[in-house]
Structure formats: C-alpha cells, structure tokens
Amino acid sequence: MKKVLITAFEPFDGERINPSWEAVSRLHNRLIGGAEIVAKRLPCAFGTSLEVLYATIDAVKPDLVIAVGQAGGRADMSIERVAINVDDARIPDNAGAQPIDEPVLSGGPAALFSTLPIKALVAGIREAGIPASVSQTAGTFVCNHVMYGLLHYLRRRKARGGFIHIPYLPEQAINHPGAPSMALATVILALEMAVSISLAVEEDMRLAGGATH
C-alpha cells in the first residue's frame, strides 16, 4: 500500500493554533486514494524543522509528501509552485532564530520546483467549489525553508512532493480584522482532494496559472 506523508506546523507568531495542524492531524491514519496517510507536526524553527522532516521521511518511506502551512492573509488554498534558496525571516522563529539573507542550502540551486501536479490540484479543488490558486512564492520564512529542503531531499528519491499554504481559520481571523478565513472542514476536504489528485495524476494539466505581478 502506498503511503502519503502530510506535514504541518506548530503555532507561531503568537497564534494559539496553527490551521495546518488542525487540518492535517485529522487525516492521520486515514485511507485516501488507496494510500495510508501519515501526519507529522514540524517545529516552526529553521534549525530543527528539516531534521524532523528528514527523519520522518526515512522512517515512513512515503510515495508522496505534501507539506502544509499557515498563510494568514491569503484567501484560498495556495498551491506553491517554487521554493527559493533564501532564509530571510521578518520575525524570529519559535526557537528565537532570525536568519537574514542566508541560504537554505549552501551551494544549492537558486530555486526548486514542486513536483506535484499543481495545475490539476487547482482545477480539482476549484471544481469542488473551494477557492484555490497557484502561488508564485512560499515566502522566505520556515514554510519556504521546509519546501526547499523537502524538494532537495526528494531529488534522489522516487517520492513526489510540494507545499500548500492555507488561510486562517475563522477563530483566528476574528483577531485579525479584515483577514480572510476558511472553515476547517473546507480545508480538510481540499487536502483530501490534493492527496487523491496527486496520487492519480502523473502529468500535470496545461492551464494558465501565472501572475502579472
């Protein structure tokens, strides 16, 4: 049976919860698309997030890895296209580290691209009535750090991988006036679809998903 590893993060930046873990934890031990789901919470810390991720990949030996993170202020399921080889933290991580203009991987490529069928994910999630789009930036905080590290680690492995950013949950958005949110049940459904589509689609669709700015 195939295995799918889905990761999420602990709360950070003063939040009581992280919507990524609230959603991903509910998928643990589920069967989706004929595959067993393994959920893992990562520390929101540059120094240890990849250590935990790599150890989990080695233990689980997944066929597919989807990392999920919070993007407060975004309104939809943001399917990330690319990770860049830069850590530039606007705020300290949960361990107090705040790297500025440092590489994720010294000597590594400037960027690494998701190996998920990102256009098919957007199309499928939208078809279910859930807002989704291709995102051209995963930021320069721990989410981008994990996405870059993940894609680098999978280069010599058969597994596919990528990153999805999700909005605040409503209970978070009330503390951020004007910020969009998405219900937990909707996020969970979208992630279920992301797993199913990623397992089923080998060659991505050719659909416009770029940005003008």
Curated annotation (Swiss-Prot):
Example of a GO MF term: pyroglutamyl-peptidase activity
Biological processes annotated in GO: proteolysis
Broad class of enzyme this protein falls into: hydrolase
Pfam family, one: Peptidase_C15
InterPro entries, alphabetized: Peptidase_C15, Peptidase_C15-like, Peptidase_C15-like_sf, PGP-I_bact-type, PGPEP1_Cys_AS
PROSITE patterns in alphabetical order: PYRASE_CYS
EC number of the protein: 3.4.19.3
Annotated protein name in UniProt: Pyrrolidone-carboxylate peptidase
Lineage summary: Bacteria, Pseudomonadati, Pseudomonadota, Gammaproteobacteria, Enterobacterales
